[in-house]
Each structure stands twice: as structure tokens, then as C-alpha cells.
Amino acid sequence: RHYAPDTKVVLIDSDREKFVEYINNEAKLRKIGVIVSEPEAKTLENSGASVISYGSDARSEAHNLFDRLRSVDELGCDIVFARLPDKQGIGLAIYNRIIKAAGYEIIHI
């Protein structure tokens, strides 16, 4: 897996509202982490998940993604989730990088 942490990474294909609901439920069951954009990080502050923000816009997200993936193992989580990014513009570069790190594992909600 390309630039993948040892911790399992799973992508969630959903809108923001369903993603937040899914994370809130998963955080009740096990120790989880999430890698999200800054706006999503704010909505997950009280979820019980360990939250890693990779930036406030697509450019910073693309720039910070590998560093954030490497920091995942330090969280001590059972699993880490990320929402599947938009495939438009620079989002496509983020998509291509993170899907490889997740070993192409996607949950569609």
C-alpha cells in the first residue's frame, strides 16, 4: 500500500452528514481515528474519535496528506476513516493518493 500507515485506513463514500453520523456511531464501538478537512474536523470534535485535519482547502490537503497518513500510527487507533474526496481538480490528486493508502477499501453509505 502506497504511503500507507500500519493502521488500517478505510474510505467512506458519503456526504458530510452521513459521514459524521457514521463516525459518531463507530467511535462508540472502538477506538477510531479520522483524517478530514478542517471544516469536517470541527463537526467531529465531540465524536470521541481522534481527529487529524489535513488542511482547510484542497491545496493544503494535497500538501499535508502524506504527513498526516504517517502520523496515523501514533494515535493508537484500531482503524482510521477518511471521507472519499471529490475527484474534481486537485481533489483528484488527493483521491489517487488516499485510495492507494486505503488499499482501495471503500464503504459506500
Question: Which functions belong to the PLM regions below?
Answer:
Residues 1-103, 107:
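A C-terminal functional module that forms or caps the active site or interfaces directly
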